[in-house]
Every structure is written in C-alpha cells, then in structure tokens.
From Swiss-Prot:
Known role: Core component of nucleosome. Nucleosomes wrap and compact DNA into chromatin, limiting DNA accessibility to the cellular machineries which require DNA as a template. Histones thereby play a central role in transcription regulation, DNA repair, DNA replication and chromosomal stability. DNA accessibility is regulated via a complex set of post-translational modifications of histones, also called histone code, and nucleosome remodeling.
Positions bearing N6-acetyllysine: K8, K9, K13, K18
Cross-link Glycyl lysine isopeptide (Lys-Gly) (interchain with G-Cter in ubiquitin) placement: K125
Biased composition (Basic and acidic residues): 1-20
Phosphoserine: residues bearing it: S12
Family indicated by similarity: Belongs to the histone H2B family.
Record-level GO cellular component terms: nucleosome; nucleus
Segments of this protein annotated with the region Disordered: 1-39
Protein name per the record: Histone H2B.2
Subcellular localization(s) per the UniProt record: Nucleus; Chromosome
Length: 131
C-alpha cells in the first residue's frame, strides 16, 4: 500500500528573521581569502567563429564544452606529433615545419589542405605585422 498523501498547505509569507552580522577580524578574512583559479577555454573564439558562419545561431553551454574539449584534443594531438617529429630529426625546438607536417599526418585529406593553407596565411600575417 502506498503511504497516505500529506495535505498541501500554502507557504507562509512571514519575512525571514535577520541575524546580526558576524564581526570579522582582519586576520581571519586574510587567511581565508582564495583567488579563484582561472579556467582557460576557447569559448570566446568558438563563439566568434560561430557568429561569422551562422550569425543567427546560438550555442548551449554543453555544446560549448564539447567544442572546447574537441579543440583541446586536436591541439594536444598536433603538439604530440610535432614533438615526435622534432625528436626524430634530433631537434629540441618545434618549428612551423613540424606543426605543418603534424597537421598533414593527423587531419584527413582536404581538411589537412585547408588547415595548412590557413595556418600558412596566419603565420604570414603575423610575420608581416611584427616587422
């Protein structure tokens, strides 16, 4: 048997009691202050690209989290592959050449071609701006 249902009573509208504010000493607040750790994400950049391609489309927090994880994963794969390539060639520095080769190895076909051309364009733009 199911337990009998309790009768619903309207919530009372009485104001909540105000408690006196606790006095804080300078030493106790300084010891408990914590700086909020910053979480670095690509959210603002993903949002800008979304608005360039689809101005009237939004993105949910969960979808943004998935996109952020995707970007982190791709960057990690490229960096790892570029690191291996530098080690094979007995170099201690990852250059644009290693990144380009890593992109060609990781991304498939046409996507790799577009990524390489956009990357080359970005590096050229950066180089001309810094001169």
């Amino acid at each position: 048997m199911a337990p009998p249902k309790a009768e619903k009573k309207p919530a009372s509208k009485a104001p909540a009691e105000k408690k006196p504010a606790a006095k804080k000493t300078a030493s106790s607040t300084d010891a408990k202050k914590r700086t909020k750790t910053r979480k670095e994400t690509y959210s603002s950049y993903i949002y800008k690209v979304l608005k360039q391609t689809h101005p009237d489309t939004g993105i949910s927090q969960k979808a943004m989290s998935i996109m952020n994880s995707f970007v982190n994963d791709i960057f990690e794969r490229i960096a790892s592959e570029a690191s291996k390539l530098a080690a094979y060639n007995k170099k201690s520095t990852i250059s644009a050449r290693e990144i380009q080769t890593a992109v060609r190895l990781i991304l498939p076909g046409e996507l790799a071609k577009h990524a390489v051309s956009e990357g080359t364009r970005a590096v050229t733009k950066y180089s001309s701006a810094s001169n």
